[in-house]
Regions:
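Short beta-strand-to-loop junctions in surface cap/lid or active-site-entrance loops
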Residues: 5-14
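Cap/lid segment of the alpha/beta-hydrolase catalytic domain
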Residues: 15-107, 152-159
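Short amphipathic alpha-helices and their capping/turn segments at secondary-structure boundaries
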Residues: 9, 36-40, 133-135
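A generic local structural motif
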Residues: 5, 33-34, 130
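Short, glycine/serine-rich, charged loops/turns that create anion-binding
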Residues: 12, 25, 124
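Primarily recognizes the serine-hydrolase "nucleophile elbow" in alpha/beta-hydrolase
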Residues: 100-166
Length: 167
């Protein structure tokens, strides 16, 4: 699968890299003065802002706001299709995170740095980012997760939650 991405490169990169995964769009925080620019300047790092399958440019054509409104989330069709093929949609997205990590690592000049990636997952991209970090902890220097469920116990205790099928 082809995944869209934007690369932000500082004038003098230090060899550090951030994989930035937003739950709505790779360009969401890319505006001047936005979170991506701040990350790039703070760490003098290359930032790869990418979209996982079903997010941003790879969303399907139907009107997701109306189709999946409520408990199941916007990706309900894709989630059920994944299960029909014997796979988990979260698992597929986790594979996307790991593939993007490999791409970034392979194209990174480390200049003595660890070569590990700083991973940022936000919203719908946070859970696949969490799974990728759990499956390949040696790949990541740090992991930051924003706007996701607080605990799995919260999902079990709540019979219905927003976007529960995407979790």
């Amino acid at each position: 699968i082809n995944l869209p991405a934007l690369a932000f490169v500082p004038p003098k990169p230090t060899g550090k890299a951030v994989l930035y995964l937003h739950g709505l769009s790779m360009a969401e925080d890319a505006k001047p003065g936005g979170r991506i620019e701040k990350l790039m300047k703070k760490q003098n790092a290359i930032v790869l802002s990418a979209e996982l399958r079903g997010i941003g440019e790879t969303e399907t054509g139907h009107d997701k706001q109306d189709y999946g409104r409520g408990q199941f989330g916007r990706d309900v069709q894709e989630i059920y299709l994944a299960y029909l093929t014997g796979r988990s949609y979260v698992g597929m997205r986790t594979g996307d995170v790991l593939a993007l990590t490999q791409f970034l690592s392979a194209n990174l000049e480390t200049d003595g740095n660890s070569g590990k990636i700083h991973l940022v997952g936000q919203g719908e991209a946070a859970i696949p980012a969490l799974h990728a970090a759990a499956l390949a902890p040696e790949q990541f220097e740090s992991v930051a997760l924003d706007e996701m469920i607080a605990t799995w116990a919260e999902i079990v205790a709540t019979p219905e939650s927003l976007n529960q099928a995407a979790s």
